């Protein structure tokens, strides 16, 4: 038996994250990366001190009232906490954490990717290439919209 706190990681995370967790915790992994039903989540929580869930695991009041006293923290691998009944967890004495602002830069980068792709017709060009339909060029072909000087 380990002296380390027991941690349930509910979804498959990167190998580096799982290895780091295993260094400091007695880790229980979801190797199949399957979404737990509410009852499965409760069953898995019975023998752990901490849970590292994603937004896909719902900690509703019905689930929270059945959580064991030994569970002390839900350390979310997500920005939001809308999947957690914070009032019920607070009443139970379970600390809830999240990762605020962790996705802000990535979201902005994806917004630029989508805007440039739409302006320059990247998706349409990709489909043409894959279908073998890109067999000519002309000065007006697939020009798209120039973004220089545009305001968002």
Question: Where do the PLM segments sit?
Answer:
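An N-terminal-biased, well-structured beta-alpha scaffold segment characteristic
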Residues: 1-97
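Conserved hydrophobic beta-strands of the Rossmann-like cofactor-binding core
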Residues: 8, 151-152
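Phosphate-binding beta-alpha-beta segment of Rossmann-like dinucleotide-binding domains, i.e.
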Residues: 100-151
